[in-house]
Amino acid sequence: MELQEVLHMNGGEGEASYAKNSSFNQLVLAKVKPVLEQCVRELLRANLPNINKCIKVADLGCASGPNTLLTVWDTVQSIDKVKQEMKNELERPTIQVFLTDLFQNDFNSVFMLLPSFYRKLEKENGRKIGSCLIAAMPGSFHGRLFPEESMHFLHSSYSLQFLSQVPSGLVTELGITANKRSIYSSKASPPPVQKAYLDQFTKDFTTFLRMRSEELLSRGRMLLTCICKGDECDGPNTMDLLEMAINDLVAEGRLGEEKLDSFNVPIYTASVEEVKCMVEEEGSFEILYLQTFKLRYDAGFSIDDDCQVRSHSPVYSDEHARAAHVASLIRSVYEPILASHFGEAIIPDIFHRFATNAAKVIRLGKGFYNNLIISLAKKPEKSDI
């Protein structure tokens, strides 16, 4: 089975769907919103071609569920707010939004949300039907998606960590698995495995930047949010917990060791310095803004979450419920690729053990994602300067 056929979130509206388990990602979007607004402000002041008539925007790796249109909503609100600040509120441009993800993404569930979204946009923003046009653009952002120099603003959140393929070189010439008992490039992975994953990410991210530079107009903007490497205080990440859960099942004889050793998730969490260096080396973009922030991976469990507090406060007294919440989110993201390799029957057991391990981490006040926000501008051609 092709990787692109299984590298997608759980679709639909069921209990295991991404749509029902994406409250964490709503918090990420809320943290990014002020940066998004500033990015839009700089974009509109750059006076790019045709920008006062039609702003062309894309969300790269849009997934499905309510968060998909929340990103669009935040972008439209930012554009209208900045236009009003510029005393151009009577000249609001048409906004054309492209939602992009792999072909197996549940675009249909997003389309079902559009009528109510358009009504809300008209009621709260005064934008009549037709002033914001939303379309799907299925495909991989590791290749070209749009015509040359056609886009003003590109956005991507929590997608860039996914690789275009499992790195090569994870099996030796003798057929021995180099990444035994691991499912990704963890701290325990041998140096050759870590290098293979870094090399694949470097290739993919560099290609991503080159493709986007071809699609963006000169001085167009791009806003990226992704998970980045944290520190020891953050505790094990969710991929570590998933790896532990699968190893538990191997130890119990529920899964064969060879099944674990042949499974490698195409995901890489880069460091801030790695991302920064790759942007600079590719050369098409100027870094305008770079910031990191931490979120507990059980953030979003309740609306009262103080998602950045590091403590043993009473918020951790319900660690089992919080751990189950985290397990549901991770299941909604990784179930398709796990089921394609291990089979559907074992999935509930994997995430039962995942939740057990996550509860131990949460009880200790650990379990954080380190996040990177980076705002980029396409460098102008010499003829544009």
Swiss-Prot record:
This is Probable caffeine synthase 4. Mg(2+) binds at N179, D261, F263, N264. Binds 1 Mg(2+) ion per subunit. May be involved in the biosynthesis of caffeine. The keyword S-adenosyl-L-methionine applies. The keyword Metal-binding applies. It holds the Pfam family Methyltransf_7. Its EC number is 2.1.1.-. Pathway: Alkaloid biosynthesis. It comes from Coffea arabica. Keywords: Alkaloid metabolism, Magnesium, Metal-binding, Methyltransferase, S-adenosyl-L-methionine, Transferase. Signal peptide: none annotated. Belongs to the methyltransferase superfamily. Type-7 methyltransferase family. GO terms for biological process: alkaloid metabolic process; methylation. Disulfide bonds: none annotated.
